[in-house]
């Protein structure tokens, strides 16, 4: 999918009349290229904390770029730190325990559950996520995450469905329609499912309950200042349809921009075409970086 996605973005940018130079490695920034702005889609480089590589290189080379500053990218991708920020801002999130590589692995005592979720603390699309039922299994999975080069985050399994809110924030926080994945509330969604490697029963639909939408938007407005300014993002929550409980899961500051993913489909529902979406995000990013000036702040 990513090859199709990246090609679609390139075609849209070129159709705007932009002179696009294509590269597939951060090494292009080892020597300063002759460009005015970097539109990076290399958000995962296959190693820990790779999401900070492109903004760091652009900062080093004094090149304006899409996304958010390196420190904000690092904060947003550290699930534990974002959950700490959520708690500080009064946004509900599940209890959790962080196990950094090289630190002692001692059993947590401040929460318990029938099932635990163990995940890499800085991964995407549920990569490396597993289920455990007791401390012995939890400890084994922590060791596996560490062996793979990740810090490990442990949480109770949360029954419910995923709800996702696409947000742009270069000049001010602007929210697209809230989307949800209807799926079995007791099943853990997998990396293979989210990446399209296996069939999924999860169905992406628009959320239409105005009170629920207002609640999710309110939580997001509370937490967004912790990672602002950012050009675009996707905020993820878990909603239990039975208990009505909502918990913040994570935020992706430079989420998948493909037209067939959440942000593209939400924009279409809002009456914004895919080219208009990319142009809006790009204009906001360029204004944030001082490349252009916009007449109207909307």
Show which residues each predicted segment covers.
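ATP-binding N-terminal substructure of ATP-dependent carboxylate-amine bond-forming enzymes
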Residues: 1-65, 71, 76-77, 81, ...
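Anion (oxyanion) recognition and catalysis
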Residues: 14, 59, 87, 146, ...
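Active-site nucleotide/adenylate-binding loops and adjacent lid/helix of ATP-dependent enzymes
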Residues: 20, 30-31, 73-160, 214-217
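Glycine-rich phosphate/pyrophosphate-binding beta-alpha loops
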Residues: 125-126, 184, 252-266
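Phosphate-binding site of ATP-dependent enzymes
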Residues: 133-218, 241, 245-247
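Conserved metal-phosphate-binding beta-hairpin within the catalytic cores
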Residues: 167, 224-257, 267, 296-297
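Active-site "cap" helix and flanking loop/linker of ATP-utilizing ligase/carboxylase catalytic domains
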Residues: 180-233, 265-298
């Amino acid at each position: 999918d990513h090859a199709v996605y990246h090609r679609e973005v390139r075609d849209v940018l070129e159709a705007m009349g932009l002179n696009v130079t294509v590269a597939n490695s951060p090494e292009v920034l080892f020597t300063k290229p002759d460009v005015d702005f970097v539109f990076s889609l290399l958000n995962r480089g296959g190693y820990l904390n790779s999401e900070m590589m492109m903004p760091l290189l652009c900062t080093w080379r004094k090149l304006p770029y899409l996304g958010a500053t390196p420190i904000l990218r690092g904060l947003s991708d550290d699930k534990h730190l974002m959950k700490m920020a959520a708690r500080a801002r009064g946004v509900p999130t599940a209890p959790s325990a962080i196990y950094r590589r090289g630190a002692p692995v001692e059993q947590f005592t401040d929460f318990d559950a029938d099932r635990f979720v163990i995940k890499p603390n800085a991964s995407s699309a549920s990569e490396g996520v597993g289920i455990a039922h007791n401390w012995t299994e939890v400890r084994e999975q922590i060791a596996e995450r560490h062996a793979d080069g990740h810090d490990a985050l442990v949480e109770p399994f949360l029954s419910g469905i995923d709800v996702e809110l696409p947000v742009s924030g270069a000049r001010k926080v602007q929210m697209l329609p809230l989307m949800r994945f209807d799926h079995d509330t007791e099943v853990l969604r997998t990396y293979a499912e989210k990446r399209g490697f296996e069939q999924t029963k999860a169905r992406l639909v628009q959320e239409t309950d105005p009170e629920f939408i207002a609640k999710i938007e309110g939580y997001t407005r509370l937490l967004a200042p912790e990672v602002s300014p950012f050009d675009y993002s996707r905020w993820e929550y878990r909603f239990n349809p039975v208990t009505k409980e909502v918990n913040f899961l994570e935020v992706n500051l430079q989420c998948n921009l493909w037209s067939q993913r959440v942000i593209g489909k939400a924009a279409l529902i809002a009456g914004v075409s895919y080219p208009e979406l990319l142009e809006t995000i790009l204009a906001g990013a360029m204004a944030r970086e001082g490349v252009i000036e916009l007449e109207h702040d909307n």
